[in-house]
């Protein structure tokens, strides 16, 4: 297995570090949709646990290049435009995905008054419209909307959890007091009125959307935990190069584990499952999700477009289209806010450290035994301890909002501490390299103490 890991890292490194090729924009010449010159042959990043490159099948495919985004991980261009449209590109530069104007027919003739714009054709004659240059009217409407903005009053929840009447009198945080992190009701995006209800719903839902903790031993025959780690490590690099939001990565791993919990898969299809799950998660979370051709591209065209789409369909149907799943990142966002306190400036280093620890947990199959909320709370505990080993990392505010006592975190914190301590010698360096950058405050280079005092786990 060590040879597999070494081969995988050297292969991936050569494909993504020294010879990372960016896709080029289509040319406006007569050969605008012709394939660009063949690039140097690269082995698929996960070729040692996947099937061989399907170069022979690709020679017969009519796929051509596209320039949607540029990403270092890509090794070959993606498909965007059908070659049959090449003759039309000389006369029209209209994007192929843009809907036709309602004022024009298929043959290009005008079907209504040419002086009337296509946008005007959608206007209802029964509604009075405000022109863009009527500034006073727009300002008046905005002022009226703001004056009528109403945020529902706070209400108590069951068992006085997050009771506003109790927290409203607590202004400062010490070992016996709780900071009200939901006091900023002036920002509607914080959903402060419903924050506690949302958290309770997430805690109830996480048990229903969790994968089996023993599926490797019980279900899988050709795939093991090491291969899973290699796949997740590669997907972390993919998400970083494509600049995907963290939620996409966490959902991707959740979909992979849930699918593997009930479906036997061969190692040749493991990378296919990974890119299909990432494509689903990207569609769910991203504003501009990568196209299916791009996911074929990042595998060095190991899989055809139809294969990725078929796997996507299999995953969606097996998961019954239940794509909303509470992940560690969902809980971590709120727990970081609780760790900061309402009156403290956001501590970027603490947030980066907690995110680093949480992403390390994605690589480890055994961490599935811990719930996402427990991993998030433990990541906050360990992050605070690493940044300041002299202070007790847990307090009443964190206990209140996470609903975990310090003693309940002990097992998970120990597992995360082990991951942090061995990260520098790990053969899966994607997370460490990611968080060794300046934009993440170099948190991966922080020293992780090997021992945490027992009294820090005593409930205060």
From Swiss-Prot:
Q: Which PROSITE patterns match?
A: CYCLINS
* UniProt KW Cell wall biogenesis/degradation keyword: no
Q: Name one GO cellular component term.
A: nucleus
Cited SMART domains = CYCLIN (SM00385), Cyclin_C (SM01332)
Q: What is one Gene Ontology biological process annotated in the Swiss-Prot or TrEMBL record?
A: mitotic cell cycle phase transition
Q: What SUPFAM superfamilies does UniProt report for this protein, alphabetically? A: Cyclin-like
> Would you say which domain of life the source belongs to?
Eukaryota
**Which residue windows does the record flag with biased composition (Low complexity)?**
10-19, 100-111
Q: Region annotation Disordered: residue ranges? A: 1-52, 95-126
Q: Pfam families, from UniProt? A: Cyclin_C, Cyclin_N
Extract one GO molecular function annotation from the record. Answer: cyclin-dependent protein serine/threonine kinase regulator activity
Q: Which Gene3D superfamilies does the entry link to?
A: Cyclin-like (1.10.472.10)
**This protein's UniProt keywords:** Cell cycle, Cell division, Cyclin
Keyword hit for Cell cycle: yes
Which family does the similarity line name?
Belongs to the cyclin family. Cyclin AB subfamily.
Subunit and partners: Interacts with FZR2/CCS52A1, FZR1/CCS52A2 and FZR3/CCS52B.
What name has this protein been given in UniProt? Answer: Cyclin-A1-1
Q: Which gene encodes it?
A: CYCA1-1
């Amino acid at each position: 297995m060590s040879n597999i890991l070494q081969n995988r890292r050297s292969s991936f490194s050569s494909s993504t570090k020294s010879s990372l090729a960016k896709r080029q924009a289509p040319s406006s010449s007569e050969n605008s949709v012709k394939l660009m010159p063949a690039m140097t042959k690269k082995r698929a990043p996960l070729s040692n646990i996947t099937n061989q490159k399907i170069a022979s099948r690709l020679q017969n495919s009519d796929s051509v290049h596209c320039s949607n985004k540029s990403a270092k991980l890509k090794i070959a261009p993606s498909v965007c435009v059908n070659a049959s449209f090449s003759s039309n590109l000389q006369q029209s530069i209209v994007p192929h995905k843009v809907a036709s104007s309602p004022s024009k027919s298929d043959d290009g003739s005008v079907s209504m008054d040419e002086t009337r714009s296509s946008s005007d054709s959608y206007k209802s004659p029964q509604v009075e419209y405000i022109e863009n240059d009527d500034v006073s009217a727009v300002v008046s409407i905005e002022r009226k909307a703001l004056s009528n903005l109403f945020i529902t009053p706070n209400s108590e929840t069951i068992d006085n959890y997050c009771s506003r009447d109790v927290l409203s009198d607590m202004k400062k945080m010490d070992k016996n007091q709780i900071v009200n992190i939901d006091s900023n009701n002036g920002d509607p995006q914080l959903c402060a009125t419903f924050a506690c209800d949302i958290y309770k719903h997430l805690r109830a839902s996480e048990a229903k959307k969790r994968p089996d903790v023993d599926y490797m031993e019980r279900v899988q025959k050709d795939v093991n935990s090491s291969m899973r780690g290699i796949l997740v490590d590669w997907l972390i690099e993919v998400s970083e190069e494509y600049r995907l939001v963290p939620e996409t990565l966490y959902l991707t791993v959740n979909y992979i584990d849930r699918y593997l919990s009930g479906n036997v898969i061969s190692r040749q299809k493991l990378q296919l499952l990974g890119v299909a799950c990432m494509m689903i998660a990207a569609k769910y979370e991203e504003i501009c999700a990568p196209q299916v051709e791009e996911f074929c591209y990042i595998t060095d065209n190991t899989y055809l477009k139809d294969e990725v789409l078929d796997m996507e369909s299999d995953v969606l149907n097996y998961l019954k289209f239940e794509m909303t799943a509470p992940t560690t990142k969902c809980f971590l966002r709120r727990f970081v806010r609780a760790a900061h306190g309402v009156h403290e400036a956001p501590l970027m280093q603490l947030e980066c450290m907690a995110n680093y620890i949480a992403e390390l947990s994605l690589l480890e199959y055994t961490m599935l035994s811990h719930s996402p909320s427990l991993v998030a709370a433990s990541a906050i505990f360990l992050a605070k301890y690493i940044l300041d080993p002299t202070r007790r990392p847990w307090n009443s505010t964190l206990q209140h909002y996470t609903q975990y006592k310090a003693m309940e975190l002990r097992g998970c914190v120990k597992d995360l501490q082990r991951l942090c301590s061995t990260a520098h010698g790990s053969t899966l360096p994607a997370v460490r390299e990611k968080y060794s950058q300046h934009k993440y405050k170099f948190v991966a280079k922080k020293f992780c103490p090997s021992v945490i005092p027992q009294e820090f786990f005593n409930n205060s």
